[in-house]
Amino acid sequence: MRRQLSRSVLGMATATFAILACTTAAGPAAAADAPYDVLVFSKTAGFRHDSIAVGTQAIRELGAANSFTVTATEDAATFTTANLSRYEAVVFLNTTGDVLNPTQEAAFESYIRAGGGYVGVHSAADTEYGWSFYGNLVGAYFASHPAIQQANVKVENRAHPATAHLPQTWTRTDEWYNYQTNARSTARVLATLDESSYSGGGMGADHPHAWCKAYVGGRAFYTGGGHTQASYAEPAFRSHLLGGIRYAAGRAKADCRPETGYTTLYNGSTSGWSQAGPGSFSNSDATLTSVGGMGLFWYSAKQFTNYSLKLDWRMPGDDNSGVFIGFPPSSDPWSAVNNGYEIQIDATDAVDRTTGAVYTFKSADIAARDAALNPPGEWNTYELLVEGERLQVFLNGVKINDFTNTDPVRSLAGHIGIQNHGTGDDVSFRNIRIKELGGTQPPPTGGTGPIRGLAGKCLDVRNAATADGTQIQIYTCNGSGAQTWTVTSGGGPVRALGKCLDVSGGGSADGTKIQLWSCNGTGAQNWAAQADGTLRNAQSGKCLDVSGNNSADGTVVHLWSCTGAANQKWTLP
């Protein structure tokens, strides 16, 4: 019968998770699944694959080894609301044509809406063309295929349980489908076909082959593989099927939201990264694994302000690590601790120091976190969504924390990095990617407080002096009067210590000094916040700029042609 999953994944003893051998080195053992039930449906009303029998047997064997019971049928009459409720997942195994009548379709729709799972294998995409619900569920309909041949499958998501065991390039022989539409807009693509590796591809550079999605309350996984009998004897393909079934049945969690527009920071290459402090990270199979510490592997090539950062992580047991954001460049890992924020990875610490917490600042929603978390030994995916000084944390696609920074000494803008906590705290990371959101926030309407810029540093009157001509700089935020500015709503003077932010001599040349000066109402003291985060002097049309893109304390600010770069972005009160 359909069984409800009630166990917590935190603090569980590790047990052997039996799957047939994979093509890459085995990772740490994962917890055994609570028992569940799977319906395998293989009715055909068109072409019939000779691999259906061996495919059904393979799924039975996977079930026997991995905590699920299989019922196999080609009788569409089993599609009733009462009967389907017995199963956590339904596999459409090489179905073809119109296999369900309207009453049966309605029962299956109700099953999915109630949280059921769907797995489509190969010609499941050549099924039910006239049923729009099914078309949206499967993700794309079959269009054509060339002859059976060898091809390279490019695995772009190696956190999902269906693909985590696979290498970045998976070479195998099968019948390779072209589809009528690209599934990427509605599903998370897990793997694509490299059309340069075989003949007859018809979708170009982006040819999805396997994907997953959440759909109207349920879960769906589809793979284009599985035409040949030999497929079901391949250990890697069997594990691929198993992972898809586990996801559809709700036994493994994954972020299956559509994903586009991200830039890779790490997927095997460490270019642009630097190690701060002791310890290191090993780099093998496009996977970083922490060694020793306490140190920090940080992306030193660029700082970020408004962005979505995604990464995949796995810990083998009760381990400790975290993702740091919003810190200035430094070879000292404690700079990130003292100036930025850590989103924690730790199975068993206190609630404000465990997985999903903004370390010591705000606990995750523990119930939501536990429901979304895969246990030690399995991969998880974080999204850290930073918009101004607001941070939202998503675990496997589920929001588990929402935090707003109000500390004038810290900021969410700056560098990002991953922690190597110490010997024995072994956490691995994959596929670190980022999407910069740009000027998504409207300009402020005026207020009093700090003006934060590059690396979260504050606009500062040097030495808190009040003499006309005092240099303006950036400095670590400290809440002093030298960093307390009053911004005029809609544009105008920006004041601190009773005087105004001023362009020296009313100049317009790049590099003109920015200083403190007695307020005089001239254009040299007229500043307007822009939607892209810059602060523009209206008279010159140029921007307040941190010299040399240098975030060190004491770096001067000057006037410069507006570029929208990070050293011209300011968060105003």
Feature annotation, model-predicted:
Residues 92, 97-166:
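A glycine-rich, often tryptophan-bearing local segment used as a flexible ligand/cofactor-contacting loop or short
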Residues 441-466, 481-509, 523-551, 566-573:
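Extracellular glycan-recognition/adhesion modules and their associated mucin-like linkers
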Residues 1-32:
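Secretory targeting and sorting signals
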Residues 257-441:
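Carbohydrate-interacting regions of secretory-pathway proteins
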Residues 321-331, 470-476, 512-518, 556-561:
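Aromatic-rich beta-strand patches that line glycan-recognition/binding surfaces
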Residues 140-217:
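Catalytic beta-strand/loop cores that center a nucleophilic Ser/Cys/Thr
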